[in-house]
Amino acid sequence: MVGVLLSVTAGSAYLGSAVVARHRAQAAADLAALAAAARVAAGPETACAQANAVARAMRVSTIGCAVDDLDVVVTIEVRLAVGGWGSARAAARAGPTKHA
């Protein structure tokens, strides 16, 4: 019985950690993409450097940064806090809206 309770508790902690990591990854990707979009006029290198700086400040890893015209797409990865197994990834796009 104790083993079952410990297994359920460990599983719940891991699931909770995964949800938190996913939300952290999306928030960091959104903020990094907005920061990069604000610097896109200075060039793609400057924009991606700004995205990396924001990611470092939020203690997450930048997987990718792509600039296409005025659009910036940033991909972020966050390691799970519990167990250290796996990670959560999220991507965000920032730039002007496209009008038809």
Model-derived features with residue positions:
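Alpha-helical assembly-interface signal, strongest on the long, hydrophobic N-terminal helix that forms
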Residues: 1-47
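Low-complexity, S/T/G/P-rich flexible repeat/linker segments used as non-globular hinges
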Residues: 82-100
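Short amphipathic secondary-structure patches
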Residues: 34-80, 96
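A general, composition-driven signal for non-globular sequence regions
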Residues: 16-20, 73, 87
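Alpha-helical scaffold segments in soluble metabolic enzymes
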Residues: 31, 50, 91
